[in-house]
């Protein structure tokens, strides 16, 4: 969707990073943070806070909130999310509401999506055409 630059990071990759896993998604998040190219939306923050485990993870989230760019889930994003949900279902694709909102947000702001969730491989091409 985006052409280089900023990335909207999905909760799937944030969780890998926050839990200190040495996975590829965790390393990609680390690199995006170092380059100042990490972003998230309110929906992702809710998901992360809802699943935060222990004080170390909560402290890391608090610190990240002051340095990671927040992309608002505004009226345009919600409109794209509804359209993306409808078009995805028409193609027989089922994705979580959270993934739909993140993909719509990325489409709205022309951002890349960092993820480790197979739903995105199916819905991002649809979102790119919104």
What are these regions (language model features)?
Residues 1-6, 103-130:
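Acidic, PIN/NYN-like endoribonuclease modules and their adjacent C-terminal/linker elements
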Residues 47, 68-90:
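Acidic catalytic patch
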Residues 14-15, 45-48, 120-121:
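A generic structural signal for short hydrophobic patches within well-formed alpha-helices
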Residues 1-40, 50-63:
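Short, well-structured N-terminal submotif of metal-dependent ribonuclease cores
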Residues 35-37, 67-69, 107-112:
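Short active-site oxyanion
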Residues 26, 45, 58-61, 78-81, ...:
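A general structural signal for well-ordered alpha-helical segments in protein cores
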Residues 11, 42, 75, 97-100:
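Conserved glycosyltransferase catalytic-site signature
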